Amino acid sequence: MPKHPAAKAPPEQQTSLHLQSFLPYRLVVLADQVSHCIAHIYSDRFNLTRPEWRALVALVELGPVSATEIAAHSTLDKMSTSRAIKGLEEKGYLRRADAAEDRRNKIINLTAAGRGLYNKIAPLVLAQETYLLEIFSADERSMLDRLLRGLEQRAQDLQKQN
């Protein structure tokens, strides 16, 4: 695959860009719109930041893990992960303990309050997702999932090339 795939495109495609139909722009706008609607739930109603919510969900999905594993699973950078963990710990939603194999490492686990908070928020954000997707048939939702996975893979390929 060439270093810069766009170099293969005809010149008119390289110089004529219409923002409203430019896929990266449309994806960012859509992601922002959806994210703001969902953030309203966990931020305004439950006083969580976006990184705190993502870390909380990662802990539900992964169980007791290190901060590094939370960061990797939720695509948060180290600083955001650290702040999210600190914030959740201060709010009583998680606790840190020394790792058995190396006391310098910490294992992070949800508290009962953290699990309870997740159980309150998850149905609300899942209802938002259901609302967004109910305009599609089951086949269309399946196709959308395949298309998104394809775009994610291509974006990862582009990142590796750059």
Feature-to-residue mapping (PLM):
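Alpha-helical linker/hinge and terminal dimerization helices associated
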Residues: V34-I41, S74, L117-L133, L151-N162
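Charged, amphipathic alpha-helical coiled-coil/dimerization segments
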Residues: K3-K8, H73, K86-R146
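A broad helix-preferring feature
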Residues: V28-A39, S43, A67-A71, D77, ...
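N-terminal leader segment of winged-helix/HTH proteins
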Residues: M1-F46
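Short, locally clustered residues in the helix-turn-helix/winged-helix DNA-binding domain
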Residues: D32, V57-E61, A122, R149
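N-terminal helix-turn-helix DNA-binding core of bacterial DNA-binding proteins
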Residues: H18, H36-S80, K160-N162
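C-terminal regulatory/oligomerization modules of transcriptional regulators
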Residues: M1-S16, D139-N162
